[in-house]
Curated annotation (Swiss-Prot):
One annotated GO molecular function: 1-phosphatidylinositol binding
Compositionally biased intervals (Low complexity): 553-564
GO annotation terms (biological process): clathrin coat assembly; clathrin-dependent endocytosis
Pfam families: ANTH (PF07651)
Organism: Arabidopsis thaliana
Biased composition (Acidic residues): 323-345, 355-369
Protein name (database record): Putative clathrin assembly protein At5g57200
Positions of region (Disordered): 310-381, 536-591
Amino acid sequence: MGTFTSFRKAYGALKDTTTVGLAKVNSEFKDLDIAIVKATNHVESPPKERHVRKIFSATSVIQPRADVAYCIHALSKRLSKTRNWVVAMKVLIVIHRTLREGDPTFREELLNYSHRRHILRISNFKDDTSPLAWDCSAWVRTYALFLEERLECYRVLKYDIEAERLPKASGAASKTHRTRMLSGEDLLEQLPALQQLLYRLIGCQPEGAAYSNYLIQYALALVLKESFKIYCAINDGIINLVDMFFEMSRHDAVKALNIYKRAGQQAENLAEFYDYCKGLELARNFQFPTLRQPPPSFLATMEEYIKEAPQSGSVQKKLEYQEKEEEEQEQEEEQPEEPAEEENQNENTENDQPLIEEEEEEPKEEIEVEEAKPSPLIDTDDLLGLHEINPKAAEIEQNNAFSLAIYPPGHETSAPSNSLSLIEAGGSGWELALVTPQNNNNNNNNPRPVIATKLGGGFDNLLLDSLYEDDTARRQIQLTNAGYGFGATAIPGALASSNPNPFGVQQDPFAMSNNMAPPTNVQMAMQQQQMMMMNNQSPYNNNYSPYHHHQFSPNPSTSSSPNPFGDPFLALPAPPSSTTQQQYSPNHMLL
């Protein structure tokens, strides 16, 4: 066993010498690399002070941040590659001492580097070369967890407990920590971080062969030095938390109670840890503080308060306060300017009066301001804007010539013939004027009765008559232009006598065929049928005019039978020369 131990020491010394030689040749930071290698060599002893000081100077504030980052990278590389617990322990000791005694720039760069790469997470580290190495490897992993938690506590607290300068409180002989002056929310955030750090510290209790190792005791002494300040910071925070406890909400009070209970348990564990460390050689010169337990009666009082504590939290109160401020600001912005001017005038007039009257009139002014608040911009009853008037649509409606021709504003409704003349003179499509605005009749001096002129759906009876009259006139013009104009002279009279609305009176469905001439055979058949009907109706004329059935109608255009098949001469042209002779010569057929 002794031969194997000597071989390992010789092999470790050879590796250190080789690494130093390579650093002298290839490294750009020769002095820093050599100092790191010599401070973390394989010799089972604490790092030499001169090598540690070189590392302190390389990571000082006067050096570039790149040099500090390179130092952290070199230490991380040294820790990740080694499988020897002595080298790993020395690397952690150098990091711990630099955090405690070095410049804050090293702490900041190490925190930034740990976000990208976890330098202190060595949970898989193990040196199983000997039973001593086995026990020491376990303590190395615990020590690394404590240093990692120390960085996390610094991230939460924004300051280092060991580097904190404790001010003296007014009227007190002892110094106080920052936790004694923190608010309730900060205490609920920082005290759990400090308690977690103390938990990692208590876990650094060496076991087995590591208890008597000198290098382990050297590192443990550094941990014990920090335990004093950590406990004092937690104790001051607990005192401050107890003072605020009965003003907290139930949610915050539950958190505070858990912190208070954990502080009592950690005080017991820390007292046991101190008793365990008092037997160490390096801890003989330490003065361990006396730890006191919190009274159980106060713990019961805190539990009773939680049962009756209010539900709303301090955060909710702040949010409600902010919402009230925003609502007040919005109300002030929505208030009109005129009431403000009136208030100023009232204040000017009231300045001459006694103060008692001013106090009595202030509530009245507040009531007036509340009554003068403007209505909301959006009307909830008309979300679709159905009652809004489009200015463009109103302008088109006013400029519509057809609607003005039917219902001119300020005058009574004209006859259908007048509207027909206006339509023929040139108007827009009659489809656009089917529905007219309801306020046209209201402008007339003598409005027409609503029941007599209005149909279902808001349509006007006169409007429909004029539209159908316009349609009949247009069709007659088209038929005349097409060559079917024999009965054109009789059309205006027929139109004037007929009802313009075809749906108002039942008419002949074949009335439109009067302007078209039937075929010859049909005309002869209709002529015979007509003569037979005339003979049956007038027997007196049949006795004296036996040949009257050969006589043509004297004036076919004057007959206006609604059935085209009962009046065959309506479509036949009259002879130009024999018309007058037939009227005065009843026996002209005998010639």
